[in-house]
């Protein structure tokens, strides 16, 4: 069972209004479960319980998701000695996002992560055939693409990200959906092993430029072009409209490089660019 400040506020509100039972989500907004309020305890379906102090702790940690284990709270976060990075699952009003050393991997200001992903995929609809999701993260792109595609290959090189995804109810499809093949690998190297014209669509949603400059390189774009089928479509995330990195217009530079390797009909779409081969 997972709980965040959203559910904690609901529970404390119910107690304040002297309500004895309330339906809340224990899987980060996918489903609802009945919670009983008795003798200052909040009793969960499996018999575990929390008190007001524990719920107040959750509310104070409003960028953290908590596992309920043995009537105690465990933050869904970790620090990697190998990467020297801090990873945590951050709640929203629907699907959570992942934060890596303070940087959130989804656009959360104007959209929830799930809606953000839908819009990215919608930029190159209809999705069909075999799809490449270059940078998995929590897997929302792969999961939503699998609804329409015949098969999805998704790549993630950071095992810590995969570990966080294992705790996320919204990422369940990564590990159970037979239409999704998750590769624990660096897409910069892995793409060289893919056959020519292997994919009908590609969704390239890389980390920001400062964290993965090679995924914005001409060399990598040549590989994207090579593995995409004729008339296949590419979505490339570039960031907020008008945003610049060190005074560099990233979208403009990406546009130029995509055209240089052969992509056509390059156009601005939701937080990125869409184009065809």
Predicted regions mapped to residue ranges:
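N-terminal auxiliary segments of SAM/dcSAM-dependent transferases
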Residues: 1-91
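Conserved class I S-adenosyl-L-methionine
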Residues: 127-138, 153
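Class I S-adenosyl-L-methionine
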Residues: 241-277
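Conserved beta-strand signature within the Rossmann-like core of class I S-adenosyl-L-methionine
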Residues: 231-239
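A short glycine-rich, Lys/Arg-flanked "PGG" loop and its adjoining helix->strand segment in the class I
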Residues: 216-230
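Conserved alpha-helix/loop element of class I SAM-dependent methyltransferases that forms part
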Residues: 111-129
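S-adenosyl-L-methionine
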Residues: 155-196
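Conserved SAM-binding loop of SAM-dependent methyltransferases across substrates and taxa
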Residues: 138-150
């Amino acid at each position: 069972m997972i709980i965040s400040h959203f559910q904690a506020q609901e529970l404390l509100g119910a107690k304040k209004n002297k309500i004895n039972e309330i339906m809340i989500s224990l899987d980060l907004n996918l489903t609802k479960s009945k919670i009983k309020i008795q003798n200052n305890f909040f009793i969960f379906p499996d018999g575990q319980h929390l008190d007001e102090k524990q719920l107040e702790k959750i509310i104070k940690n409003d960028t953290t998701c908590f596992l309920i284990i043995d009537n105690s709270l465990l933050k869904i976060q970790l620090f990697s000695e190998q990467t020297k990075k801090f990873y945590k699952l951050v709640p929203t009003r629907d699907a959570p996002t992942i934060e890596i050393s303070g940087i959130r991997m989804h656009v959360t200001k104007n959209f929830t992560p799930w809606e953000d992903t839908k819009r990215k995929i919608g930029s190159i609809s209809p999705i069909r055939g075999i799809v490449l999701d270059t940078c998995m993260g929590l897997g929302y792109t792969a999961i939503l693409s699998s609804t329409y595609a015949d098969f999805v290959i998704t790549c993630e090189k950071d095992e810590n990200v995969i570990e966080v995804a294992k705790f996320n109810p919204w990422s369940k499809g990564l590990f159970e959906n037979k239409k999704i093949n998750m590769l624990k690998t660096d897409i910069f190297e892995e793409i060289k092993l893919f056959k020519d014209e292997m994919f009908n669509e590609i969704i390239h949603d890389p980390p920001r430029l400062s964290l993965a400059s090679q995924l914005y390189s001409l060399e990598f774009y040549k590989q994207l072009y090579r593995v995409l089928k004729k008339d296949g479509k590419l979505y490339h995330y570039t960031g907020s409209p008008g945003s610049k990195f060190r005074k560099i217009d990233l979208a403009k530079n990406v546009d130029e490089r995509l055209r240089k390797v052969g992509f056509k009909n390059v156009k601005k779409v939701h937080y990125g660019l869409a184009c065809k081969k």
